[in-house]
A protein has these predicted regions:
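C-terminal substrate-binding/catalytic lobe of Rossmann-fold NAD(P)-dependent oxidoreductases
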Residues: 263-265, 271-326
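N-terminal secretory signal peptides and thylakoid transit peptides that target proteins
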Residues: 2-23
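Conserved acidic residues
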Residues: 87, 120, 204
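N-terminal Rossmann-like dinucleotide-binding module
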Residues: 27, 31-103, 194-197, 227
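Rossmann-like dinucleotide-binding domain that binds NAD(P)(H)
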Residues: 90, 204-278, 282-289, 344-351
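A contiguous active-site-proximal alpha/beta segment in oxidoreductase catalytic domains
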Residues: 153-223, 361
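Beta-loop-alpha module in the N-terminal Rossmann-like domain of NAD(P)-dependent dehydrogenases
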Residues: 93-95, 101-166
Length: 393
């Protein structure tokens, strides 16, 4: 399966990639449902989850929305770069939300649902809250608010399907993506795969490397990259590793290495043709180099591509190169109320991620049939008590 159009929601990834840079021109296409109100013409955004392992906490996304204290951010020598502004924020620790609000000029709220009706879009920026996304986003989806939900979306297919149900029933677009889906190498590799199909090539296999050192949070970097290139027609998956998290916790084991294997049941892409022969894509996940490589083997030879390392003292170009396309994808969804990836594609990505997790945790890295994953199987959270359930009433 592949990113596809679902109803009137467009999701052609190449169209999006080529138009994302001009997305601010789409403001006039906003519906009345999402039209910002008040003095500002900017899209009003609410953010939640500002603590450990949050893209907002590390100043990755926030300065792309708001100028810190109304001025140019000391780490970011730039002015406004998007058509969005963070107006409200929430965190499980109200003091942290207050500090964020003071820094970026927005309003901190005490309850997770206090932003409903006050924002045009919601960004769920954390990782530790993933186990509770299904509850945290419910009131926003029920209100029809477009929601960006950070990877890996859900820890069970039951929760993933509930989020999708709420999205569909309330016409509330959702987005779950990763910056490695937007890098140039992913686009070039996808186009190359399509060309191989048009040329009648037979795929023999592929090998890849990924920066990630822990499956639960950053393993999706590599997984989502591969799915952006080859699609989601994965029949079986395995994950061999010595752990799954970056540190030891009461529920987690420390991970230093991992190997992901995707068994594709052939390959088919609209307008490009198909290849019926099954093949395996293998990816070595290591720590800590921030790069991705891919080599594709076919019946006429090899083709490879590499995403150069982006580590270094100057994080400014790295952050913009990697993270800005994701922020623009949020803006596009908030403005147009269209989904880039279909609900089916989001569910496919989540199912493959969870099946690999199950392979590691319960089957010593054996290949598991993706379709056989029970909806109620739940992957562990490294911080199982991160959210106090009493906040949900």
């Amino acid at each position: 399966m592949k990113p596809c159009t679902e109803g009137t929601m467009t999701s052609d990834r190449r169209t999006f990639i080529t138009t994302a840079a001009a997305v601010t021109a789409a403001a006039g296409a906003q519906t009345a449902h999402s039209q910002p109100s008040g003095k500002s013409d900017l899209i009003r955004v609410g953010v939640m989850a500002l603590g450990d392992n949050s893209h907002m906490n590390y100043d990755i996304w926030a300065p792309m929305f708001n100028l810190a204290n109304g001025e140019i951010h000391p780490k970011w020598p730039i002015g406004r770069t998007t058509n969005m502004i963070i107006t409200h924020c929430w965190d499980r620790e109200y003091e942290r939300a207050e500090a964020f609000a003071k820094k970026f000029g927005c309003t901190a709220v005490k309850n997770y649902d206090d932003m409903v009706g006050k924002v045009d879009g919601l960004v769920c920026a954390g990782f530790n809250e993933c186990k509770w996304w299904v509850k945290l986003v419910r009131p926003y989806l029920e209100a029809g608010t477009p929601c960006f939900i950070n990877r890996p979306f859900a820890y069970s297919m039951k929760d993933a399907k509930e989020i999708v149900r709420l999205s569909k029933e309330n016409n509330a677009p959702i987005l779950c993506t990763d910056e490695r889906e937007y890098i140039q190498q992913a686009v070039v590799a996808r186009n190359k795969v399509e060309q191989f199909l048009r040329d009648g090539r037979t795929f023999l296999g592929a090998d890849s490397t990924n920066a990630s050192g822990e499956w639960s949070q950053h393993g999706v970097h590599g997984l989502y990259f591969l799915l952006a290139v080859f699609g989601t027609n994965v029949k079986k998956v395995s994950y061999v590793a010595d752990g799954w998290w970056k540190e030891k916790t009461p529920t987690a084991t420390l991970q230093h290495y991992g190997q992901l294997n995707l068994l594709y049941d052939g390959l088919s892409m609209d307008g490009a043709g198909s290849s019926e022969r099954p093949f395996i894509v293998s990816q070595h996940q290591c720590w800590p180099k921030a790069d991705i490589s891919l080599r594709i083997s076919h019946d006429m030879g090899l083709w490879d591509i590499q995403h150069e390392a982006t580590t270094g003292d100057n994080t400014f170009p790295r952050h913009f190169y990697l993270f800005f396309p994701t922020v623009l994808a949020m803006q596009r969804m908030f403005e147009t109320r269209e989904m880039q990836w279909s609900h089916e594609y989001i569910l496919d990505k989540t199912r493959i991620f969870l099946t690999a997790f199950k392979s590691h945790l319960e089957h010593d890295g054996a290949m598991l049939d993706v379709a056989s994953l029970p909806d109620d199987w739940e992957a562990p959270s490294p911080y199982a008590d991160w959210i106090d359930e009493s906040i949900f009433g």
